[in-house]
Amino acid sequence: WRALLARPTIRAAVLTTAAGHGLMILVMNATPLAMHGEGLNLQASGQVIQWHMLGMFLPAFVAGPLVDRWGCRLVACGGAALLIVSAIVALLGITHWHFMISSCLLGVGWNLMLVAGTTQLGHGHAPNERARAQGLMELSNGSVAAVMSFASGALIAQAGWAAVNIGLLPIVTLVVLVQIAQWDRRRQPAERSL
């Protein structure tokens, strides 16, 4: 995996998918806890989860064509921007509508980051490296998801709902900066031959 991670395209792809996946899990594990803490009922939590699921999977019909048209980096940055907007909406209020809109935007952002990052991964490796590259990405996503899942409850209990949303901002910013750096970088010799 060291040789794969030496390639900027692979690093950007793995960071994008792992960050999107981990942050989505962090926020969505904390969301029902925050809603309960604000006195919202189980039905409201169920509706928020429904809208989040729509946000996660409904864009599947357009995410691929968006990547084809605008490219992996721009779509990844668009997904990251939606995570930022999601956090801002969550920070603006604690009503049912704030939770629902924020969670839906979080789902759409996750979808765009996942599709863009996965496609970007495919541009960074040779066909004979496919299984190793996919394994690297899956291990990264799963590891980050596990950490964020455990961290979510502790973070909301110790620091609150606002901290969960503020905490995702530096990670999303890092994804955007890495993707922007890729725009100006000439293709690496190892990637040029792929």
Predicted regions and their residues:
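Intracellular juxtamembrane helix-capping segments at the cytosolic ends
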Residues: 112-125
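A late C-terminal transmembrane helix in Major Facilitator Superfamily
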Residues: 129-158
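Juxtamembrane intracellular "pre-TM" segments in multi-pass secondary transporters
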Residues: 1-13, 194
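Helix-to-loop junctions at the C-terminal end of transmembrane segments
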Residues: 59-72, 156
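Structural signature of the two symmetry-related core transmembrane helices
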Residues: 74-88, 169
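Short amphipathic helix-loop junctions that connect adjacent transmembrane helices
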Residues: 29-48
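A membrane-interface helix-boundary motif in multi-pass transporters
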Residues: 154-172
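Paired small-residue
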Residues: 86, 97-105
